[in-house]
């Protein structure tokens, strides 16, 4: 990639649920509002990447319309992005839940990021009050977490877990959807041509 970016966001923004779309767009929007250029990092892979099977997902159609997106890199090659992005932001979702992200190696612990590049997690989650993973995988993950410049988590219970069990200082922060002004998601909702009846939504 020839273009350089201030920040690369790594997460599961390509997932097929609207919650992920809203979360990652809000994170992207918040960082862009800081005056930073942002690259959304495509799904890393260990084996064969089946791009065709993902091509028509509504999440990818949305992403292509709103983001700059990196190519999909094998986990052995994703380190090339160190020359593209100055900093890497991980989050926000259950990216440290072993059963969710084990297929990506340790990419979601930013193991590929060089020492000179900033490494930040924002509202990342273990999905439980314990870090459940095979011992060898866990120790490498903890080593990667200790290399990060800043660690924050979505659930308060994970603050205590990080500090008492893993020896990592973590901060409890808001989900990205609560960082943005009301027009952030309102503007993209207005892009839809679907006709829906008025209703009331509650976010808890």
Regions found by a protein language model. Give the residues of each.
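Active-site anion-handling motifs in enzyme catalytic cores
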Residues: 1-204
């Amino acid at each position: 990639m020839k273009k350089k970016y201030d920040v690369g966001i790594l997460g599961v923004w390509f997932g097929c649920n609207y919650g992920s779309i809203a979360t990652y767009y809000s994170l992207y929007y918040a960082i862009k509002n800081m005056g930073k250029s942002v690259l959304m990092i495509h799904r890393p892979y260990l084996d064969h990447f089946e791009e065709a099977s993902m091509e028509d997902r509504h999440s990818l159609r949305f992403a292509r319309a709103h983001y700059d997106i990196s190519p999909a890199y094998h986990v052995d090659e994703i380190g090339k992005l160190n020359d593209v992005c100055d900093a890497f932001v991980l989050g926000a979702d259950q990216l440290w839940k072993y059963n969710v992200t084990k297929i990506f190696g340790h990419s979601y612990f930013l193991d590929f990021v060089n020492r000179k590049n900033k490494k930040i997690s924002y509202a990342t989650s273990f999905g439980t009050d314990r870090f459940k993973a095979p011992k060898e995988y866990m120790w490498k993950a903890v080593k990667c977490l200790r290399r990060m410049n800043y660690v924050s988590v979505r659930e308060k219970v994970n603050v205590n877990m990080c500090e008492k069990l893993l020896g990592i200082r973590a901060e409890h922060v808001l989900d990205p959807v609560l960082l943005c002004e009301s027009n952030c998601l309102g503007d993209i909702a207005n892009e839809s041509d679907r006709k829906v009846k008025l209703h009331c939504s509650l976010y808890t």
